[in-house]
Amino acid sequence: MALKNYKPVTPGQRQLVIVDRSGLHKGKPVKGLTVGLTSKGGRNNYGRITARFQGGGHKRTYRLIDFKRRKFDVSGVIERLEYDPNRTGFIALVRYDDGELSYILAPQRLAAGDRVISSAQSVDVKPGNAMPLAAMPVGTIVHNVELKPGKGGQIARSAGSYAQLVGRDQGMAILRLNSGEQRLVSGTCMATVGAVSNPDHANVSLGKAGRKRWLGKRPHNRGVTMNPVDHPHGGGEGRTSGGRHPVSPWGKPTKGRKTRSNKATDKFIMRSRHQRKS
């Protein structure tokens, strides 16, 4: 879908660029595929802030998305594409031939009336079809990729994202991710063909602070604007540079500091995303 550029008729419309969602469903979601969602405001069960700069925003209903795609060999037709406030990509409502309804992530170039199928064997390589990585031809663009068989897709789920199958090695599939990382994933893991819809999300300009508040995002204050009691960069007469390498409010180095500590899965990373891209 295209972008909508606004003329500065009002201050809030100056530099406003949003995604044109006129082609999406305008009604409510399927009630049986939704659950309630409680706004946490970045607080944990003690009421303490654990995620800063969150809170407010429009009330949301959570849509139950089928990330596993394990309804094998039952074809379905795309009823409609819908907006989902809980993610950046769009979602698609699938009506399977046995009558069941389900939401899936909508890939690019998927439209109402198209048919999709999921299978444990090889099926047509077209957007929306799901199959194990071992059944896909090398070079396929995929999204919603599982890291563990049966757990559901975890990789390449946000707007416009995808991974590419670049090879195979002893029952494992080699994926190139958006970050440049190349990693091994079991060939029995499911993935869906295509890239996630709404690639123009990266070009959105909200135009005013209030539109960010509607999304549940609160103002993000820099450390150098704070007092010394609040942040290691705080204080000083006039504007200062912080006087030290960038750190978090708790004194931990930030901006480039590596934080990965899962040594058990290091063996699956063939090329780090930190290596210079060739």
From Swiss-Prot:
Coiled coil: none annotated. One of its GO terms (biological process) is cytoplasmic translation. It comes from Chelativorans sp. (strain BNC1). InterPro entries: NA-bd_OB-fold, Rib_uL2_dom2, Ribosomal_uL2, Ribosomal_uL2_bac/org-type, Ribosomal_uL2_C, Ribosomal_uL2_CS, Ribosomal_uL2_dom3, Ribosomal_uL2_RNA-bd_dom. Belongs to the universal ribosomal protein uL2 family. NCBIfam families: rplB_bact (TIGR01171). GO terms for molecular function: rRNA binding; structural constituent of ribosome; transferase activity. Residues 214-278 are annotated as: Disordered. This is Large ribosomal subunit protein uL2. Part of the 50S ribosomal subunit. Forms a bridge to the 30S subunit in the 70S ribosome. Pfam families: Ribosomal_L2, Ribosomal_L2_C. GO terms for cellular component: large ribosomal subunit. One of the primary rRNA binding proteins. Required for association of the 30S and 50S subunits to form the 70S ribosome, for tRNA binding and peptide bond formation. It has been suggested to have peptidyltransferase activity; this is somewhat controversial. Makes several contacts with the 16S rRNA in the 70S ribosome. Keywords: Ribonucleoprotein, Ribosomal protein, RNA-binding, rRNA-binding. HAMAP family: Ribosomal_uL2_B (MF_01320_B).
